């Protein structure tokens, strides 16, 4: 049966998510941990797709895509990435489009599973009162012994130019929503990546945090509300700093951010 249903019947709380860089399957439980871990590892290791299951999931995902496309905060975020990046996969919607998922077949999914669902491309993370040696033994027992080739990824060439300076989209909202983004040179792996992340987070707090002079000035003038904030994201091959929220005068707020920076 469905692995997530089996995990639920076994007392676990399973779920899954896909981001721009990762697909993850996980569960929480207070008992039967080893058994649940074996179920999860078997689930991701042994693919099984039929035309019926693909058609069913296509309908569900299509509904989710339509719902997300009607969400203002998601639209402003995806528009930001499309404006910032020329070729990075980050500019492509994670769930795809209704048209693109219509082309998916069981063969497509088997090919993707073979390419990406390989132990060489996986990470297993366990948090709790467990013994690492026992976890490693379970993983070695369940996961395939053979290791595929390390996948060479091509995220395209990105320079510091943006695709579009500004994009507007009309939607039914009580107050305009906006985001402004700044492309940053991506750091290398390891310590450089962590250092960039820490420095950028500190910079965001100093410049955009709710105790910053900029935030207080804009708030006192009624130009922003509690939704205003900023952050820093790193994805494979790219990095960017962003700020935004709700405002009746987004252009004024953006100019103030640029002046402060």
Language-model regions, residue ranges each:
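Short amphipathic
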Residues: 162-170
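A domain-level signal for the structural core that forms small-molecule/cofactor-binding pockets
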Residues: 180
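Charge-rich, well-structured scaffold segments of protease-associated domains
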Residues: 2-152, 168, 175, 184, ...
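Short proline/glycine- and acidic-rich turn/helix-capping motifs at secondary-structure junctions
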Residues: 154-163
């Amino acid at each position: 049966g469905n692995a997530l249903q089996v995990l639920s019947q076994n007392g676990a709380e399973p779920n899954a998510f896909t981001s721009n860089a990762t697909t993850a399957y996980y569960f929480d439980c207070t008992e039967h941990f080893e058994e649940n871990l074996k179920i999860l590892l078997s689930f991701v290791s042994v693919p099984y797709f039929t035309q019926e299951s693909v058609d069913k999931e296509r309908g569900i995902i299509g509904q989710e895509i339509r719902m997300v496309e009607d969400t203002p905060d998601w639209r402003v975020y995806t528009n930001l990435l499309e404006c910032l990046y020329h070729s990075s996969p980050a500019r492509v919607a994670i769930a795809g489009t209704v048209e693109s998922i219509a082309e998916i077949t069981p063969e497509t999914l088997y090919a993707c599973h073979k390419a990406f669902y390989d132990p060489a491309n996986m990470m297993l993370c366990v948090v709790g009162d467990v013994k690492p040696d026992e976890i490693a033994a379970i993983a070695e027992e369940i996961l395939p012994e053979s290791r595929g080739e390390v996948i060479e990824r091509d995220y395209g060439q990105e320079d510091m130019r943006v695709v579009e300076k500004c994009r507007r989209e009309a939607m039914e909202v009580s107050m305009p929503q906006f985001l402004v983004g700044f492309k940053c040179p991506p750091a290398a792996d390891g310590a450089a990546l962590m250092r960039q992340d820490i420095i950028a987070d500190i910079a965001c707090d100093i410049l955009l945090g709710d105790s910053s002079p900029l935030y207080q000035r804009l708030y006192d003038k009624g130009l922003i509300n509690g939704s205003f904030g900023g952050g820093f994201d790193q994805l494979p091959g790219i990095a960017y700093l962003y700020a935004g929220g709700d405002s009746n005068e987004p252009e004024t707020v953006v100019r103030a951010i640029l002046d402060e920076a």
